[in-house]
């Protein structure tokens, strides 16, 4: 967040008002859930009965990742047809789209999934070595500065790289300005250098690192810019003054916590609920034996890796005691499914879209009727996807 504010402060001095707000904090929260590992939740400390503290990992169903995957599959498939008015033009188009550099068939669905995870993304096209290149840029690497409602026609994309100079590391931040107005697309670059990670630093001559890039680059008389912003089609209730979209998982963090808490408990049920046999501690002590060669060695009368037998004090002259816990699997499964129904309904997919059977997670993507909630949500998301592909 400091870098975004740092950029905004520097740009304000140049008369450019960047929109930062709270959206980038939200993106980082959602990104950690999308990755499936949230600090202080999936990794936490626990105090044991003896007062010692141990680190514990909470298991996850990875629902944020699953949701973004499924929404991508609902709104974009390999059956989508992109064609121009002639067969020859269509072939030329696909030659560009599915070049080794662009690999649109593979990269666009992955990009779309990340858009759903972060709320926003941008495609940028440029020429490199005579080839048209598509850059798939995530929403946390762009800052809008010119927009009308949710239509963004001025933005900054961010890229960073590091150089080693002796014992020091030099952190470079490359800012690219994209602006489209009055049928003119302008692309301008700035370069900043810092010795501290996360800071913008001071502006340096862009040409020192990129001498072959024309700067600025102006395209006059164009109908569309060489960039397309895509955002989720849901209202931004976290930062209502921002033109950025919000992650589709943003309003469901509490549900993810509830699901993972129950799932972790469900999996622990099989570990903690295992059959145990209590024996006196003296019964598991080893002894000394003489082998065939006359050597004395220590032997254990119990397999140390055997978790069934548990040694306790105070059971002298008592028979072994068997404890067999009753597993609460059905209660856990029902509780998880109740949360999944609440979650899928909140996503606009309808209750019952997800179902956990104890072994795997089932998804009702096979048949979606035209009058279902999931179908209407699918159509809503398809609209923004079609718009960005059409402009591309």
Residue ranges and their predicted role:
Residues 1-153:
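Extended, helix-rich architectural segments
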Residues 18, 36-37, 74, 78, ...:
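Short secondary-structure junctions and interdomain/linker hinges
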Residues 26-58, 311-346, 362-385:
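Extended, non-catalytic structural segments that build the interaction scaffolds
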Residues 61-63, 106-113, 120, 129-131, ...:
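Intrinsically disordered, low-complexity boundary segments flanking structured domains
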Residues 89, 100, 104-108, 251, ...:
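Short amphipathic alpha-helical segments
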Residues 117, 122-246:
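Extended, regular secondary-structure scaffolds
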Residues 210-369:
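Extended, charged amphipathic alpha-helical segments
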Residues 390-392:
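A preference for well-ordered globular domain cores
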């Amino acid at each position: 967040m400091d870098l975004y504010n740092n950029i905004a402060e520097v740009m304000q001095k140049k008369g450019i008002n960047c929109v930062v707000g709270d959206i980038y904090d939200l993106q980082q929260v959602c990104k950690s859930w999308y990755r499936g590992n949230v600090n202080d939740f999936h990794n936490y400390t626990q105090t044991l009965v003896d007062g010692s503290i141990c680190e514990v990992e909470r298991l996850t169903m990875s629902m944020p990742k699953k949701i973004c995957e499924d929404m991508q599959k609902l709104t974009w498939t390999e059956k989508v047809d992109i064609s121009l008015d002639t067969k020859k033009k269509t072939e030329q188009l696909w030659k560009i789209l599915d070049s080794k550099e662009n690999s649109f068939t593979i990269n666009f669905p992955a990009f779309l999934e990340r858009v759903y995870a972060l709320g926003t993304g941008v495609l940028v096209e440029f020429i490199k070595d005579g080839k048209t290149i598509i850059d798939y840029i995530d929403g946390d690497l762009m800052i809008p500065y010119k927009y009308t409602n949710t239509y963004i026609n001025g933005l900054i994309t961010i890229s960073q790289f590091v150089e080693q100079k002796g014992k020091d590391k030099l952190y470079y931040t490359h800012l690219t300005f994209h602006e489209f107005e009055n049928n003119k697309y302008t692309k301008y670059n700035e370069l900043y250098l810092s010795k501290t990670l996360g800071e913008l630093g001071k502006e340096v001559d862009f040409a020192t690192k990129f001498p072959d890039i024309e700067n600025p680059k102006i395209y006059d008389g164009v109908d569309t810019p060489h960039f397309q912003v895509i955002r989720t089609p849901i209202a931004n209730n976290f930062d209502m003054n921002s033109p950025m979209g919000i992650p589709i998982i943003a309003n469901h963090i509490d549900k993810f916590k509830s699901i993972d808490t129950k799932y972790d408990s469900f999996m622990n049920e099989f570990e903690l609920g295992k059959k145990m046999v209590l024996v006196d501690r003296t019964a598991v002590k080893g002894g000394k034996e003489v082998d065939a060669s006359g050597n004395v060695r220590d032997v254990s009368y119990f397999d140390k890796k055997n978790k069934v037998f548990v040694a306790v004090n105070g059971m002298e002259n008592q028979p072994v005691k068997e404890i067999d816990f009753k597993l609460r699997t059905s209660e856990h499964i029902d509780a998880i499914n109740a949360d999944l129904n609440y979650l899928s309904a909140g996503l606009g997919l309808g209750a019952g879209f997800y179902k956990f059977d104890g072994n795997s997670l089932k998804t009702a993507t096979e048949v979606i009727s035209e009058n279902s909630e999931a179908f209407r949500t699918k159509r809503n998301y398809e609209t923004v996807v079609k718009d960005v592909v059409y402009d591309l």
